[in-house]
Each structure stands twice: as C-alpha cells, then as structure tokens.
Amino acid sequence: MSDLPFTLDQLRILKAIAVEGSFKRAADSLYVSQPAVSLQVQNLERQLDVPLFDRGGRRAQLTEAGHLLLNYGEKILSLCQETCRAIEDLQNLQGGTLIVGASQTTGTYLLPKMIGMFRQKYPDVAVQLHVHSTRRTAWSVANGQVDLAIIGGEIPGELTESLEIIPYAEDELALILPVFHPFTKQETIQKEDLYKLQFITLDSQSTIRKVIDQVLSRSEIDTRRFKIEMELNSIEAIKNAVQSGLGAAFVSTSAIAKELQMGVLHCTPIDGVVIKRTLWLIFNPNRYRSKAAEAFSQEILPQFATPDWNQDVLKLVQKKLVVNVLDAAIPNTSDDG
C-alpha cells in the first residue's frame, strides 16, 4: 500500500465520533457539518475496505476494525502534536505552549499563582491549565495531553508504573465556621464538639472528602456521625454557604487565605488534630518534554514545594524531566551512564 488510506482529519473525526457517541455531536465538536463527517467516514471505510461503525443502534458503536484504527490513530495524533511542539521549541521559549494539569483545589488556588510567575518571565509562551478530577488528569499526563500535573487524590493503580510520581507539597485542611458561631470564641474545640455541628461537604466521592474521612478516622473521629446539612459541588459554594451561616466545613487552607484576612470566615483548630494531605507532582518520563515544561519545572515548581521536599523535587525534576526527542527515540550508546 503506497499511499496512506487515511488523513489526520479523518483520524480526528473518528476520535470525535468515538468520544461523542454520534456523528452529529462529533460534527458539532469539530465545527463542521454532519454530512461532511459522514462523507469522510464513508471515504475512510471505502479506502480501508472495512466497516468502522455499527450503525444499528442509537449510539455510534465502533467495530473491531474501528477500535483498532482508533487505538493507533490516537497515538498518531499525539505524536503529531509532540512533533509540532518540538519544532516550536526551536524558537527557544519565544513561543510554544505549556500545558499543566491539576485537580480541583490545586487548579483553583495554587496553579494560577505559579502560572502567573511563569508568564511574567516568559510572556511569549502560551499556557493552558486543565482542571479535572485526579483520575482524568493522571490519564491526560500518561497519554501526553498534559506536560505535568499537581494533584491531591489517589492516582489510578494502572498508571503508577508509567508515571513519575513525586511528593510535592503538604496541603493542610482546616475547619471553617461562620464568624458569629459560638465556637469562634474558643481557642480550640474538642473532637466531641464536631458532632454538634451541621456540615456542608462536597459529595461523598470527592477526593478531599475521602482524605478528611481517613485522617479524622486516624484521630478516632467518626465522620459517619457528622450531621450533613448539604452537599455542594465546589469549594467556592461551600465557603459562601459557611459565610452565610448554613454550617461548618473542612477546606484546604490555600482556599481560605483571602476570607480569613477579610474576617468573613473563622478557622477553628481541633485540639490534638492536624489534617494534612500530600499533593503529588506527576509527569510521564517517556514523553517528549518541551523547553517550556523544563523551565516551569526547574524555575517555578521548587518555589512552591514543601521546604523539606524542595531539593528533592528540584533534583528529580532535573534528572527525570529533561527529555528531548533524541533521548526518546534513540537508545543511549554513550558511556556517560
């Protein structure tokens, strides 16, 4: 077969249909007409001489050949993106793109500060921040869609061998109360006092809520006895609800610095209990790393790491993250080790 039987655009269309589940939604996501999408798929099936979709059901289902082409197609598209970014790097940070991933709390309260510092130094580098669940973010790093990420949740077990996972910072979680709550007059409260509060929480599947449950359990506090007033879907909504007097909540201290300074929320320590979780820096050591990612990792990341881990982060990043195209493609035959 001398000529390739497909184009990059056709691979993008195939991927969009697989993700969206229908030709129409795929067309909408690609900003093209549905007939154009259908025609490209028909041409692709004719060129390959195999059906790629089972059109019998309500949802467009890939055939075995469709799954096979999608698997290779995603790798081809990813490699094309890496190639473009490697060429951009020839401009020596006078352009290019840095793509950073984050889970909800780190993406809302930590990464914007880091990106702001980076942009001041490298204003010509475009920066994208992708904020999703820990699981989705980890997969994005593994697939090469994101250069690196800082997350607070549990990384999927199937990815632990393919990712470099570095303990990056400690995130302290605090109990916040309305400023007019009686407990604000006390220097600390006791564990038993928690059972008297009405709590506002994230949903039961959220990472932070699971961490809080685990840490409190180690301190012999049974969160199953907590009175849950309401469940909300964002930290900002929880802060506003507490500020309005609807209940108490546990949130990251990074999320309440402004409110504490303004005096609109109160942080009350629990006697003998400190709630901390580890934030993780993750990246794929087998993927090409742009100069923008190297600069961000070496110049910005160490400034926000927990002091005890600062040097470890810097050493690991310098050792692991500086990977160029030749390193990724050609085995090292030198004697440098």
UniProtKB/Swiss-Prot annotation:
Residue ranges for the DNA-binding region feature of this UniProt entry: 23-42
Start and end residues of each HTH lysR-type domain: 6-63
PROSITE patterns listed in its UniProt record: HTH_LYSR
SUPFAM superfamilies: Periplasmic binding protein-like II (SSF53850), Winged helix' DNA-binding domain (SSF46785)
Superkingdom per UniProt: Bacteria
Keyword set, alphabetical order: DNA-binding, Transcription, Transcription regulation
GO molecular function: DNA-binding transcription factor activity; transcription cis-regulatory region binding
Alphabetized Pfam families for the sequence: HTH_1, LysR_substrate
Entry similarity comment: Belongs to the LysR transcriptional regulatory family.
Function description: Trans-acting transcriptional regulator of RuBisCO genes (rbcL and rbcS) expression.
Protein name: Probable RuBisCO transcriptional regulator
